[in-house]
Amino acid sequence: MHLVLFWILTQVCVCELLYVTNRSPLHDAACQGRLLALRNLILQGHNVNVVTIDHVSPLHVACLGDHVACARALIAAGANVNVTTIDGVTPLFNACSVGSVSCAEVLLENGAKPQALVFQPSPIHQASSKGNSGCVETLIRWGADVDFDIPHLGTPLYTACVSQEIECVQRLLREGANVQKGRYMESPLHAAAEKDCTAIVKLLLDFGADIHARNIEFQRPVEAAPPSSLTEGFLLVYEATPQPLSQLCRQRIRDRVGRDRFHLINHLPLPNPLRNYLQYR
């Protein structure tokens, strides 16, 4: 037993040593945001695309630390903006993880792919789960699919509902996310109801969520809510109350306009209050 423990501890120490020794001076400078030191190292000929044993690049480290000036310097020197770690993590994913809109913008301006492959960690899902609505907006503006569906995670909207990040939920809905699309048969409304998050439940219903949708257990959202909770009570009242005609008309108009043309609503010959209403402003 003692020999086994000794071997395990030895391996841990070796792994830690490899990690430390595998980090380059560029990694250290990027991690600490030391721009002058980083530039000097680049001028000395250090490879900006050097990676650790886990394929972590200096650009990964700079973005994780929200060091946008270091990220710019690395990219200007030829750093690969789409480099991935052994886990498939990109610098853009790291930027979205910490809510660094500046780093995300720099990466996207220099060719970073706004959307991951299905089997890779997804920047828009990460931003949605962390409540980083600025990154969500940036990714969508650069072409990320607002309804990007990853089998084990669902859509960004579903992820935001599970994490109870109302600002991200609102941003995704305003950008045209499908309010019915969640994970498998579970809708975003089911997720919000299960979390007893009445504010998100109200928001989803405002955008036309189906209160009668059934999940894989054949439950409606009201049945998925915790018993005797505020959300359960709200949904029971909502089910028994006729919806305003204005709300139904807004949903119908937005459906007809289509997500790709939402930006044209501002150009419709309508009074400003009505245009604002159609855009949930």
Predicted ranges, named:
Residues 21, 53-54, 86-87, 119-120, ...:
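Ankyrin repeat start-site detector
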Residues 207, 212-281:
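Cullin-RING E3 adaptor/co-adaptor recruitment helices
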